[in-house]
Amino acid sequence: MFYQNFFKKFIKFFTIISLSQLLVVSSFAAGGGGDESKKMDVKSNYYYKAVKLINKKSYEAAIDNLLKAEKTNKKDADIYNYLGFSYRKMGNLDKAAQYYDKALKISPKHKGALEYQGEMFLTQGNLKKAEANLKKLKKICFLGCKEEKMLKESIMKYNKGQKSSY
């Protein structure tokens, strides 16, 4: 009898612990990884087309689509982040800076914008600002994230006189 009660209590305890861990893990998964302004926002077709164009390095066409997407949602940090990225890749750092600032004003912990802005700072020769962005990413990504890794790698390359691949 003692063992049956003990076993039932053990199973109940184990089930509760397992479920609570599952809830914690799923909440991290739901909020982790991406840099989306709001996970539930529906992106426009222009946004998705722009992302495809960016992946093909067609930055001018991507900018056209992102500007159209912006008209439907002026509070989407992802749109501004990709505008900053596209302008940076085209060499227009002034425009890139404006869009990274907009993205970070909307979402100060936007990992993608912090990483890409850090890359821009390195291009401008501003190591201190890039390191400040890396420090912010380390706080946001306490378990590590790809954006932190990428910026850290770029800073190491910068310190060796090498160019970043991002």
Regions found by a protein language model. Give the residues of each.
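Terminal, low-structured helical/coil segments at or just beyond the last alpha-helical repeat
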Residues: 32-43, 131-166
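Alpha-helical segment of the N-proximal tetratricopeptide repeat
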Residues: 41-72, 76
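Structural marker of alpha-solenoid helical repeat scaffolds
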Residues: 72, 106, 139-143
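Residue-level recognition of tetratricopeptide repeat
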Residues: 76, 110, 144-145
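Canonical tetratricopeptide repeat
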Residues: 82, 116, 150-154
